[in-house]
Amino acid sequence: MIIIPARLKSSRFENKVLEDIFGLPMVVRCAKNANLVDECVVACDDESIMQTCQKFRIKAVLTSKHHNSGTERCLEAARILGLKNDERVLNLQGDEPFLEKEVILALLEATQNAPFMATCAKVIDEEQAKSPNLVKVVLDSQNNALYFSRSLIPVLRDFDAKRQTPLLGHIGIYGFHNKEILEELCALKPCVLEEIEKLEQLRALYYQKKIAVKIVQSQSVGIDTKEDLQNALKIFSPNLLER
């Protein structure tokens, strides 16, 4: 099951999930991409998102407005849907309308092999890594996440040195091996690191839970601001989205 948490009042870009992407609302684009891989449900926090999904025949459920994270919203949706504890859950984003089907499939595969949860990352350049909106991740020898940060990591101490490992940009999608693990994660107390960085995935690492990271090729960009949307619409074309 794929669940897409969709919040109307995003702090940096209100109503962004309803913005038009070549004739379709953003959240509908995201759901249509997800439906190419598995059954998808949008977890809405507002009737307007719910009605939009219904208009385009996208399955949706109405959840509380008071969740602290998309993961919490996913869990409520999973409970509403009556998912069994052993059912696998993917958490995609409602602001990634350009996410490729191949990336979702890669996440699904990684989740099947991950003992706890999985996510994806892509190689980025130094200029991209400077943006705090693009989260960076560093990995251990088994391709599990060591840390996620809005800062550039790892930092080159010697300015004239060459990087021995690529910079990795996190793609904010998650796979939980089963619903029981989603329940376990949400039951953990928030930690100071996730509150400092505003990154919910740091809670898992704080409590020594493994996050497997699949490195993928992707041109997708998350839409955090109006400027992000304007830039993305210049880069992508309607034909590219009709896969």
Curated annotation (Swiss-Prot):
SUPFAM superfamilies assigned to the protein according to its UniProt record, in alphabetical order: Nucleotide-diphospho-sugar transferases
Enzyme class at the top of the EC tree: transferase
Keyword vocabulary terms for this entry: Cytoplasm, Lipopolysaccharide biosynthesis, Nucleotidyltransferase, Transferase
InterPro entries assigned to the protein according to its UniProt record, in alphabetical order: Cytidylyl_trans, KdsB, Nucleotide-diphossugar_trans
Molecular function via GO: 3-deoxy-manno-octulosonate cytidylyltransferase activity
Protein's UniProt name: 3-deoxy-manno-octulosonate cytidylyltransferase
Gene expressing this chain: kdsB
Lineage, broadest ranks: Bacteria, Pseudomonadati, Campylobacterota, Epsilonproteobacteria, Campylobacterales
Family, similarity comment: Belongs to the KdsB family.
Species annotation: Helicobacter pylori (strain P12)
